[in-house]
From Swiss-Prot:
InterPro entries: K+_transporter, K_trans_C, K_trans_N, Kup. This is Probable potassium transport system protein Kup. It holds the Pfam family K_trans_C. The chain crosses the membrane at residues 22-42, 64-84, 115-135, 150-170, 182-202, 220-240, 261-281, 293-313, 351-371, 383-403, 408-428, 433-453. The keyword Transmembrane applies. Belongs to the HAK/KUP transporter (TC 2.A.72) family. GO terms for cellular component: plasma membrane. One of its GO terms (molecular function) is potassium ion transmembrane transporter activity.
Amino acid sequence: MVQASSHAEGGHEGKQGASRSVGLLVAAVGVVYGDIGTSPLYTLKEVFTGGYGVSVNHDGVLGILSLILWSLLWVVSFKYVMFILRADNQGEGGTMALTALARRATAAYPRLRTLMVICGLIGASLFYGDSMITPAVSVLSAVEGMGLAFDGIDHWVVPISLVVLVALFLVQQHGTEKIGKLFGPIMVTWFVALGALGVHGISQSPEVLKAFNPGWAVNFFVVHPGIGVAILGAVVLALTGAEALYADMGHFGRKPIARAWFILVLPALVLNYFGQGALLLQNPEAARNPFYLLAPGWALLPLVGLATMATVIASQAVISGAFSLTRQAIQLGYIPRMQIQHTSSDEQGQIYIGAVNWTLMVGVVLLVIGFGSSGALAAAYGVAVTGTMLMTTILVSAVMLLLWKWPPLLAVPILVGFLFVDGLFFAANVPKIVQGGAFPVLAGGVLYLLMSTWKRGKQILVERIDEGALPLPLFISSIRIQPPHRVEGTAVFLTARSDAVPHALLHNMLHNQVLHSQVVLLTVVSEDRPRVPEHERFEVEAYGDGFFRVLLHFGFMDEPDVPAALKLCHLDDLDFTPMRTTYFLSRETVIASRLEGMSRWRGNLFAFLLKNANGNLRFFNLPLNRVIELGTQVEI
């Protein structure tokens, strides 16, 4: 009986585990694969109608299909699924998480470490550009299908797209927790539809399956030496969204993402591309919109509706990714602090950042109005995608060689292969800068300038504040000689340096002539890892005479809740009773000068960013009625 019972329990647990695995796989399909899953809407259309000079004939179609297939296998299956997904930072992925890993890997090489930070900032900057282009091109390409169903509706494509996109951004502040549960099933339906359409097309012209032979891709370069590399600028559209596999790893883990790719997403994409190719072999004129023309007439309107939902989901994933990237960058010190609003009481990762949301919305609206069609926007798309991919490869190279300690004989050939292919795709997109690709370059350049100015400005600000700082032991010795009047309670002074006296403490002594019975010098340390366990959260050191030094460690995915963290500090003599604790903050006003370190115009830019950044009070969740801010002017 006991055996029967244990078998029953084991079977129940096994079913639960299987159910959870399927649930994670479906959820991953809904969040991770929206972008790459909607690429069939416009990729082959752009290849054959984008002015590349590719003929819609037997050799041209098979050559392009072979290029798309082997690009998917090399870049997504081999590079991202088998290698990049292994470069997790304690389970987290994405540009900032990888940059933090690369910083750790190059800690012993300052110049190389600086290069890794630059690559990370470039990758992050291009991702923000991509976050504007993806919603615009995806929704436009979906709505354009209506023009095939109704005559004379083409002039409504832009207004309808704008309504859909603006509505998407307006609902962000309310969260997408409830409707988010539908994303997975809708995207699974989308991929099943892609596969079914592909099978239907292939059945009409099975010879298209010859494109599985990579020889057709090689032959395309031989026959078309003039456009061979240039066409990669359109082929790369089939890879848009590959970076999402890595960026969303923290939500689902490597295995569900990999399984979803090989079980559902890759087969559906390949079938659909080959189905479109089969249609083009039969009807070259279908190149004007091979995706929608692949569908039977009765299925066109339902397909437009499903495609619109799929592109909205793809856009949602990119917007959420921008919020997540911003939070990580703030914690790592690359972006000024912003107000972060949690939109779910259950899911910590569901956040909303108003400044990012409205900036993205304005960018998307301008793109839709300015370009007017998915074909015109395709030129801008490739630059952002390939640039981000290239930066990811450079960052993971440092991790593989210096952190993982892979043997160079094994790692170098693989990395050279990645860099060669990424370099080809990026080079193919460089000429597109004059055709619309300038947008992500300019947007990325502005964001890089802001992030690098903020990072450098904060470093200089700390250096200026540290100049002439009074060492803490000397200060304690002086008050032993001339003890000030001390009042009951605990004073917490936030400071970047834990071994010197904060300016706020000196100002308090100067103006109020008193000192609290307990004085805590608190330094918040941002780690290059996503989360710090509670038992590693704090370090406490007692100096005597009521002085304590406390270090609080937070990861870039942690909520920096200082009062909650201080409750964990266990020391008999240290009391953090909320109503007896006062927090003293310094509020620096920066004055740009001709001092060495930063040009005057960048100094003014940093001063503007600092003035508009969220202060320590909100960022560290300090109680409003227990905070005193003391101002000081600093020249940089």
